[in-house]
């Protein structure tokens, strides 16, 4: 979504 901090893919 916005940033891949919680879910890389």
Curated annotation (Swiss-Prot):
Keywords: Aspartyl protease, Glycoprotein, Hydrolase, Protease, Secreted
Glycosylation: residue positions: 4
GO MF terms, alphabetically ordered: aspartic-type endopeptidase activity
Location within or outside the cell: Secreted, Extracellular space
Glycoprotein among keywords: yes
Tissue expression profile of the protein: Chorionic epithelium (trophectoderm) and placental cotyledons.
The EC number(s) this enzyme carries: 3.4.23.-
Main location: secreted
GO cellular component: extracellular region
Any GO BP: proteolysis
Family, as annotated: Belongs to the peptidase A1 family.
Miscellaneous comment text of the record: On the 2D-gel the determined pI of this protein is: 5.4, its MW is: 55 kDa.
Protein name: Pregnancy-associated glycoprotein 55B
């Amino acid at each position: 979504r916005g940033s891949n901090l919680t879910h890389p893919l």
